[in-house]
Amino acid sequence: SLGSRGLGDVYKRQVESESELKNIINLSKNKKTVVNVGIRLNPNVNAQTIGKISTGRMQDKFGLTFKDAIKIIDKYKNSNSIRFKCLSVHIGSQILSNVPYQKMIRVVNNFLEKVSVNFEYVDFGGGMGIDYSSNKKTFDFKKLALEIYKFSKRNECKIILEPGRSIIGDTAVLISKVIYIKESPTKDFIILDAGMNDLIRPALYNAKHMIIPAIKSSKKSKKEYDFVGPICETSDRFLKMKKFQKLNEGEIVILKDVGAYGYVLSSNYNVRPMPKEVLVDKSKTQIISKRQSIKDLI
């Protein structure tokens, strides 16, 4: 909480409501310090992504409306307790089209023309997506760079981008063993030793992570495979795949592109230990997180 941490130990405090700003001002007065504040603007832009990770629409909980942001800045710009340092926007995650960013930048340009303070920074957030499927659709960074270049020619401020997923999303995999194969008339359930506690994105967002066999074979399954985990939730499932190679119990499969929102969202749900993390650098390997034991949980 703000009250339990120093106000001067971070570059800026992000504000998304007047209530937050009042709290910061009161704490600042008590501690006799001046706080750098960032205002988050909700640009009302549809990011064309999964609804649960869209953050820049009017119905989303994030940021201030154009009108409210102007009003709050005008009301508190002369306060001796804060400095409006940064304007922030972030419209969502796993975005593959540049159109939402173009719309967002137009809104920001319009806002900067009307606001009564000069921001040192504009933070455009992140959200640039990666290709989780096999259709090779990738984000066009050149188009985004051109839009940001045009913005920089128009506005004298430093620009921040947060392209985390696009950098690390495809740098990690989840390795799992087939522990059981449950046959049914229409499909086979491939039950893995990895569960939704290890990778929750499919259960949480209906996200799809491609699955490949560790050892390839030319033998194909005649039925659809439904890759699931061992947890007592129907949502503990990863992916349905047709024409997958025939698998046997004990074989290893690989879930791809888990570098972003993978391990960081994992948990001990169902009394399951966290998996081991191994860093691979060419031919070298290093354990960076040990696998938990049941004793660790207790």
Please identify what each model-predicted range represents.
Residues 147, 156-298:
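Charged (often Lys/Glu-rich) extended helix/loop segments that serve as interaction or gating elements
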Residues 1-7, 11:
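Single conserved hydrophobic/aromatic residue that forms the stacking wall/gate
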Residues 19-27, 31:
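Active-site-adjacent beta->alpha loops and helix N-cap segments on the catalytic face
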Residues 34-46:
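Glycine-rich, aromatic-flanked loop segments that form ligand/cofactor-binding clefts
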Residues 5, 39, 87, 124, ...:
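Conserved, mostly hydrophobic/aromatic
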Residues 43-181:
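Active-site loop/helix belt of alpha/beta enzymes
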Residues 12-19:
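Catalytic beta/alpha-barrel core
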Residues 5, 33, 82, 117, ...:
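Structured loop/turn residues at beta-strand edges in well-structured enzyme cores
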